[in-house]
């Protein structure tokens, strides 16, 4: 493990302590670098059942234990109202409109790097905030760039593309310089109880519940037909909002007569007729796109790539970068043409653009280009 010499004596950092290993090690590394470190635990969702309450209470307990071990203060704050207004209502509206949003991206934009930063500034007098995200920051020519995390498998820049360079400049990402295995090793060496804690998965307000069960409590079911791409009715669905392009599981249409053994995939959602359209094979022509139109553009450096640039794009998390060419239809509408067709590009999701290691920013996928 590389030692880090103290170089930041006196600068105050508020670390978002989630009760997980990444934020735990982030706090330790910043202390080792000489920062004055305090923790802040966010409550972003008002639980309505015992299981969710226990999960949040356990996370707070773990965060407190880590802070006690490190000898730092832990503050708590409730952002449930801000989360509901700025993240959850957007999430529901997008699903109601037949799109597939990413609430984690909106949470980072509105809560972790806005409400959290404002609270850390105004109440806790912070110089910086820090999170356990796997990204890196690089300061160059008076601006702050966001780079992919060293651990390519854990890189979370896709979820942080809505940050501006001012927010990046106020943020520290210690674990972005490490592999996940190194983070767990450090936590174990330091005797932190989170060293072997399982990484959280899924959307925080859903927890371990089934997604469809959760969504049905807020959006009533709207049953309709499932059709093949040739127009044959082969089943029914409970609501288009429960399905996403490229989905394979949970369709309930296996073992049909007169069909080959290739699995069925969702290839389109017909919102006008409330019909789910499916096709066989992961490379079904109606599942493929040659490009996309993105809007609600956000660039970390405010400028964005030049018109006609050849860069790369991710249309979903953990996807390999896709080489592409970008042109502007307007200041807030970007036309993206892939070098090769891409499967299951999904309206409502984010397209995030890169120039090598640099995360440039991105936008919301509004439409697909298929010719």
From Swiss-Prot:
Location of this chain's protein in the cell: Cytoplasm
Disulfide bonds: 107-204
Domain of life: Bacteria
Transmembrane segments: none
Chain positions of site Interaction with tRNA: 133, 349
Signal peptide: none
Keyword Ubl conjugation appears in the UniProt entry: no
EC class name: transferase
SUPFAM superfamilies reported in the protein's UniProt record: Adenine nucleotide alpha hydrolases-like
InterPro entries: MnmA-like (IPR004506), MnmA-like_C (IPR046885), MnmA-like_central (IPR046884), MnmA-like_central_sf (IPR023382), Rossmann-like_a/b/a_fold (IPR014729)
EC number: 2.8.1.13
Main location: cytoplasm
One example GO MF annotation: tRNA-uridine 2-sulfurtransferase activity
GO cellular component: cytoplasm
Active site: 107 (nucleophile), 204 (cysteine persulfide intermediate)
Function: Catalyzes the 2-thiolation of uridine at the wobble position (U34) of tRNA, leading to the formation of s(2)U34.
HAMAP family the UniProt entry points to: tRNA_thiouridyl_MnmA
Family that this chain belongs to: Belongs to the MnmA/TRMU family.
Stated name of the protein: tRNA-specific 2-thiouridylase MnmA
Species, as recorded: Shewanella halifaxensis (strain HAW-EB4)
Lineage, opening ranks: Bacteria, Pseudomonadati, Pseudomonadota, Gammaproteobacteria, Alteromonadales
């Amino acid at each position: 493990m590389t030692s880090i010499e103290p170089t930041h004596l006196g600068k105050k950092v508020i670390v978002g302590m989630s009760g997980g290993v990444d934020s735990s090690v982030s706090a330790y590394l910043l202390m080792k670098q000489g920062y004055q470190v305090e923790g802040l635990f966010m409550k972003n969702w008002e639980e309505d059942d015992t299981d969710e309450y226990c999960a949040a209470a356990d996370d707070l307990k773990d965060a407190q234990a880590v802070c006690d071990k490190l000898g730092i203060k832990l503050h708590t704050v409730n952002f449930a109202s801000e989360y509901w207004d700025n993240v959850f209502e957007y999430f529901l509206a997008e699903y109601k409109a037949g799109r597939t949003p990413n609430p984690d991206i909106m949470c980072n934009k509105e809560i972790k790097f806005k409400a959290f930063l404002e609270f850390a500034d105004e109440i806790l007098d912070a110089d910086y905030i820090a999170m356990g995200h796997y990204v890196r920051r690089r300061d160059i020519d008076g601006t702050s760039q966001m780079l992919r995390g060293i651990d390519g498998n854990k890189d979370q820049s896709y979820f942080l593309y809505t940050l501006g360079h001012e927010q990046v400049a106020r943020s520290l990402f210690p674990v972005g310089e490490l592999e996940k295995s190194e983070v767990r090793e450090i936590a174990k060496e330091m005797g932190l109880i989170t060293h072997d804690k399982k990484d959280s998965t899924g959307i925080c307000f859903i927890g371990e519940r089934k997604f469809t069960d959760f969504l049905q409590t807020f959006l009533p079911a709207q049953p309709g037909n499932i059709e093949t791409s040739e127009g044959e009715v082969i089943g029914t669905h409970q609501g288009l909002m429960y399905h996403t392009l490229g989905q394979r599981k949970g369709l309930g249409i296996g073992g049909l007569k007169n069909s080959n053994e290739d699995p069925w995939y969702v290839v389109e959602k017909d919102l006008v007729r409330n019909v789910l359209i499916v096709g066989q094979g992961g490379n079904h022509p109606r599942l493929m796109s040659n490009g996309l139109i993105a809007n609600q553009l956000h660039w970390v450096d405010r400028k964005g790539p030049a018109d006609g640039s050849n860069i790369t794009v991710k249309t979903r998390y953990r996807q390999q970068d896709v080489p592409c060419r970008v042109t502007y239809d307007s200041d807030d509408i970007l036309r993206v043409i892939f070098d090769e067709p891409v499967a299951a590009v999904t309206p409502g999701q984010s397209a995030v653009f890169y120039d090598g290691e640099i995360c440039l920013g991105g936008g919301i996928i509004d439409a697909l280009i298929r010719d």
